[in-house]
């Protein structure tokens, strides 16, 4: 069915409350979009971060009387009369099919493929991880996830243990297990991430070799041959004392979620305990790897 879209512009600190107003006016969904197409990066836990100049977009049923909606919004104290807005009719599409068509199998390194479940596996003899795109967690499309997957593909993981610190969808831990790791441990602060990792591990037949913990419940004195943390530069610096003790002597460390401009600051937090490799970059993002001294 066709839809009607109403777009308003506001500041980032007012966007969420304005979105609530659109829901009150009958919007079936509300999304936020940067007016200037600048990226917004994942906030720290408990923090909501939006752009300074934000478009708030409400989606309405095609039968909605938008004149009534506008009149209601003009009476709202946060908006008022004469507010600037844009209304347009969206063509009727099979949105689910169009969304699915955007995702294809992706290759990382020499052996590893990440494949949506509705696509044919390009190479049945390769290492294939079946993973469907979701709303919150990594699927390989982001440069930082790609950098980590390429790195894992380059390692000899046979018989090794891996810790995925900030596991999200579990994509890195699952890929490591499919690449030969004997055991993987996923840690995250978000219960939804733990559930997503569990579901994806089950789908890929590796759930018996994957242990999952909320960060507050992780066992003391964990260690592994390989540790990967694809989170953000701030947490990587703050958590360096905790992350640095996880790899065994001679073990591998891989860090990402870091902008290239932040690499030096993150590397400095780890250089005392690791022999660091040259930084690898993809687009504006980077990966820092090293060996535990």
Swiss-Prot record:
Report what the protein is called. Ribosomal protein L11 methyltransferase
Q: Which UniProt keywords apply?
A: Cytoplasm, Methyltransferase, S-adenosyl-L-methionine, Transferase
Q: Which organism is it from?
A: Yersinia pestis
Q: Which reaction does it catalyse?
A: L-lysyl-[protein] + 3 S-adenosyl-L-methionine = N(6),N(6),N(6)-trimethyl-L-lysyl-[protein] + 3 S-adenosyl-L-homocysteine + 3 H(+)
Entry-linked NCBIfam families: prmA
**Enzyme class at the top of the EC tree:** transferase
HAMAP family to which the protein is assigned, alphabetical: Methyltr_PrmA
Highest taxon of the source? Bacteria
Any one annotated GO CC term: cytosol
In which compartments does the protein localize?
Answer: Cytoplasm
The enzyme's E.C. designation: 2.1.1.-
UniProt similarity note = Belongs to the methyltransferase superfamily. PrmA family.
Q: What does this protein do?
A: Methylates ribosomal protein L11.
Q: Name one GO biological process term.
A: methylation
Q: Which GO terms describe its molecular function?
A: protein-lysine N-methyltransferase activity
- PANTHER family (UniProt xref): ELECTRON TRANSFER FLAVOPROTEIN BETA SUBUNIT LYSINE METHYLTRANSFERASE
């Amino acid at each position: 069915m066709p839809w009607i879209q109403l777009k308003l512009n506001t500041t980032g600190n007012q966007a969420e409350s304005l979105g609530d107003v659109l829901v009150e006016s009958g919007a079936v969904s509300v999304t936020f979009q940067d007016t200037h197409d600048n990226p917004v990066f994942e906030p720290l836990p408990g923090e909501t971060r939006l752009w300074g100049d934000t478009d708030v977009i409400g989606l309405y049923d095609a039968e909605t009387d938008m004149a009534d909606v506008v009149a209601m919004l003009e009476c709202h104290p946060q908006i008022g009369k004469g507010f600037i807005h844009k209304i347009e009719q969206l063509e009727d599409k099979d949105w689910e099919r169009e969304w699915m068509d955007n995702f294809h199998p992706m290759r990382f390194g020499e052996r590893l493929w990440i494949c949506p479940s509705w696509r044919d596996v390009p190479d049945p003899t390769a290492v294939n991880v079946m993973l469907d795109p979701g709303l919150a967690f990594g699927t390989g499309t982001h440069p930082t996830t790609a950098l980590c997957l390429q790195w894992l593909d380059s390692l000899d993981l046979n018989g090794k243990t891996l810790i995925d610190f900030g596991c999200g969808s579990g994509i890195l831990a699952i890929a490591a297990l499919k690449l030969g790791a004997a055991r993987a441990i996923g840690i995250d602060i978000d219960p939804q991430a733990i559930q997503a990792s569990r579901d994806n591990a089950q789908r890929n037949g590796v759930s018996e070799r994957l242990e999952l913990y909320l960060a507050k419940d992780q066992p003391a004195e964990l260690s592994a041959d390989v540790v990967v943390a694809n989170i953000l530069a701030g947490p990587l610096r703050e958590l360096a004392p905790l992350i640095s003790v996880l790899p065994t002597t001679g073990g591998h460390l891989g860090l990402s979620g870091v902008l290239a401009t932040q690499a030096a600051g993150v590397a400095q937090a780890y250089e005392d305990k690791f022999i660091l490799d040259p930084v690898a970059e993809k687009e504006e993002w980077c990966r820092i790897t090293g060996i535990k001294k």
